[in-house]
Amino acid sequence: DLINKFNYTKNVNIPKLKKIILNINTTPTNITHCLIPTMLSLELILLKKSKLTNSKFSNLNLKIKKGNVNGCKIILKKKKMYFFFFKLILDILPKINKRFVIKKNTIFYKNFSFKIETILMFSELEYYYKFFKNISFLNITIITTTLNRYEFFFLFKTFKFF
């Protein structure tokens, strides 16, 4: 559909998903209780090691010091990215009551970010509620190779994401 609609001459120019970034941030007061469960939850969902993220700036109002651990993240590419993307479309998004309301003026055409407020929607974590109940929301960023907004929306509509 993309080839017919946008008249691509080369297969390299066809827009596709580049990578998916999953990130969980923790508050400074909660860091000791939630750091190990957040890392473990991402590893259970994706079967991949997570990396710790550090704060780049200090903020005295939030009691954050520069260089302290904030949370953890995983970057997905290639097969694992598509596996997670289809799992997200087929399993997780139908469970969410809210639909995505997207403003065409504020969205960037290269990436799309949203958050899942309850991480317990994943089937791998449902049975272990007592271990993962204190985890904050999951930030998901999907990065594409689209050149304009029309390609971006058409790409996600072909995946039936919107």
Where do the PLM segments sit?
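Ribosome-associated RNA-binding proteins
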Residues: 1-162
